[in-house]
Amino acid sequence: GASKRGWTTWSIAAVDKRIVAIVPIVIDMLNVVPSFKHHYRAYGFYAPAVGDYVEMGIMGWQDTPEYKRLLEIVEPYEYLERYTMPKYLINASGDQFFLPDSWKFYYKNLLGQKHLRYVPNAGHSLDGSDAVYSLAAYYNAILNKTKLPEYDWDVQEDGSIKVTTKVRPKEVLL
């Protein structure tokens, strides 16, 4: 599911054992409070895309006990131990709601097989992008039980990305 339906993707995966894999799309906000605090610090304001939430005062609730209690129920990050199924997160590099480094608030804490893609030159709608092809490829791999690449990556102090693989790749395309 995409956007709000991406949130639903996380939510249903936390409670339904029939789910074999998930692909939340353009919902790059697990661990929502640090993510949105980072959003504000990066821009110095909340992006117009989240204006309705700002107008309703929701951003001002983030440090309240009531908001914390609400997140204990509805925040997918609260259920990390349940997301043991394969996960493919598809996000947009130019998302109007979420920053392209929001992964740093949750990705390393996800359990099991996980893959993350930021679709280049795409906004929240992913219009005009090739995202559907990577979704279809992942779907096909899950259905056919195709072994997917196993790797880990870390952003280094100098900004470079170090990738470690289980099997030496024959080729790497950037």
What are these regions (language model features)?
Residues 83, 89-91:
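Short beta-strand/loop motif that positions the catalytic acidic residue
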Residues 29, 62-79:
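Active-site nucleophile elbow and catalytic-triad environment of alpha/beta-hydrolase enzymes
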Residues 94-98, 124-125:
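Acidic catalytic loop of the alpha/beta-hydrolase fold
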Residues 99-107:
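Short alpha-helix in the alpha/beta-hydrolase fold that links the catalytic acid
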Residues 1-13:
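Glycine-rich nucleophile elbow surrounding the catalytic serine of serine-hydrolase chemistry
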Residues 130, 136-173:
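Surface beta-strand/loop "capping" patches
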Residues 19-20, 113-114, 169:
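Core-facing hydrophobic residues within beta-strands of well-ordered domains
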Residues 11-60, 117-120, 125-130:
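Hydrolase active-site cap/lid region
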